Swiss-Prot record:
An example Gene Ontology CC term for this record: cytoplasm
Organism, scientific name: Saccharopolyspora erythraea (strain ATCC 11635 / DSM 40517 / JCM 4748 / NBRC 13426 / NCIMB 8594 / NRRL 2338)
Positions of DNA binding: R317, R322
Coiled-coil regions listed: none
Binding site for ATP: L27, R28, G69, K72, T73, S74, E135, D136, Y137, R178, Y188, R225
EC number, UniProt record: 3.6.4.-
Example of a GO biological process term: DNA repair
Official protein name in the record: Holliday junction branch migration complex subunit RuvB
Main location class: cytoplasm
Region ranges (Small ATPAse domain (RuvB-S)): 189-259
Keyword entries, A-Z: ATP-binding, Cytoplasm, DNA damage, DNA recombination, DNA repair, DNA-binding, Hydrolase, Nucleotide-binding
The gene coding this protein: ruvB
Location of this chain's protein in the cell: Cytoplasm
Homology family: Belongs to the RuvB family.
Length: 353
């Protein structure tokens, strides 16, 4: 797969590069009052947290689900800030053995927040240990092997677990049921993203004009992390090739350089649609086969590209596989066949290949 000219392409996959993490941290809201968008989630979360604080109780465990880049990690940090607590951060893949989890839990102080990103990827033995920790604030440490093995209970400090997942369907029922509050994060509307871009521009000292903010927000795929990333790339363009002001013309020119089209699709999105249309005549085709065609992992296609393509009405998930809609054919400048669906199937309950 040709990556294109060096420096002329930006990936919109909402995955952070290490060099940009400090900037991302700077742009994160610190309190619920600073968090833009997700109004219903914010209202519900405020009630959960402040209700527990007023009673002097430990808040219920919290689960956030939704596509990457919508603010799940930011909300986890905000929860700790609202509670005046410390936060420990880990991820599901890092918890391979029960001992890994036991060591982390035993180091928690009373009232701490434990944030587990990608919690659906936690190993089953560690997950089973987590059940008891969430309910009774203790874990059982198994000493020895075979018939002579003994279980030693270990008390841990009361804590609040915050889990984040991009695949809520991959969570086991017992784990999901132990969260007292669950919230699904929705894609942002352009007007909300415009507020995100304006706030970030103020923090970064960017000379952002009204039309420039609207254009960046419109092409940000409904995702704040992408909006912030595009703002930084447009800022670079404005400082190097213009007078530093992010106007409409500057934003459009910059986004063209970075290969972000008018619908917010990047190279990978168009590669997925192109393969679906040109190699498989619009589908249906399984996600694994489609991923091979574009040289990516199936999880990347499924978790990064598909949610927005479905929302944009360019891709349909059907029981037989992925299908390009009329909008996808038209976006690629092609005439759609008669069998192409008019809009994406958005059911969350359809069997997927």
């Amino acid at each position: 797969m040709d990556p294109g000219p060096a420096g002329d392409e930006v990936s919109l996959a909402p995955q952070q590069e290490t060099a940009e993490q400090d900037v991302e941290t700077t742009l994160r809201p610190r309190r619920l009052s600073e968090f833009v968008g997700q109004a219903r989630v914010r209202e519900q979360l405020e009630l959960v947290l402040h209700g527990a604080l007023n009673r002097g109780d430990q808040p219920d465990h919290v689960l956030f689900s939704g596509p990457p880049g919508l603010g799940k990690t930011s909300l986890a940090m905000i929860i700790a800030a609202e509670l005046g607590a410390s936060i420990r951060v880990t991820s599901g893949p890092a918890l391979e053995r029960p001992g890994d989890l036991a060591a982390m839990l035993s180091n928690l102080a009373e009232g701490d927040v434990l944030f587990i990103d990608e919690i659906h990827r936690i190993a089953r033995p560690a997950e089973e240990m987590l059940y008891l920790a969430m309910e009774d604030y203790r874990v059982d440490i198994v000493v020895g092997k075979g018939p002579g093995a003994t279980s030693i209970p270990l008390e841990i400090a009361p804590f609040t677990l915050v889990g984040a997942t991009t695949r809520s369907g991959a969570l086991t029922g017992p784990l999901r049921d132990r969260f007292g509050f669950t919230a699904h994060m929705e894609f942002y509307e352009p007007a909300e993203l415009e507020l995100v871009v304006r706030r970030s521009a103020g923090i970064l000292g960017v000379d952002l004009r009204d039309e420039g903010a609207v254009e960046i927000a419109r092409r940000s795929r409904g995702t704040p992390r992408i909006a912030n990333r595009l703002l930084r790339r447009v800022r670079d363009f404005a400082e190097v090739r213009a007078d530093g002001a992010v106007t409409l013309d500057v934003a459009r020119a910059a986004l063209e350089v970075y290969d972000v089209d008018e619908h917010g699709l990047d190279r990978l999105d168009r590669a997925v649609l192109g393969a679906l249309v040109r190699s498989f005549n619009g589908g249906p085709v399984g996600v694994s086969t489609l991923a091979v065609a574009v040289g990516e992992e199936p999880t990347t296609v499924e978790e990064v590209c598909e949610p927005y393509l479905v929302r944009a009405g360019m891709l349909a998930r059907t029981p037989r596989g992925r299908v390009a809609t009329v909008a996808a054919w038209q976006h690629l400048g092609l005439v759609p066949p008669q069998h192409a669906p008019g809009e994406a199937t958005r059911s969350l309950f359809a069997d997927e290949v």
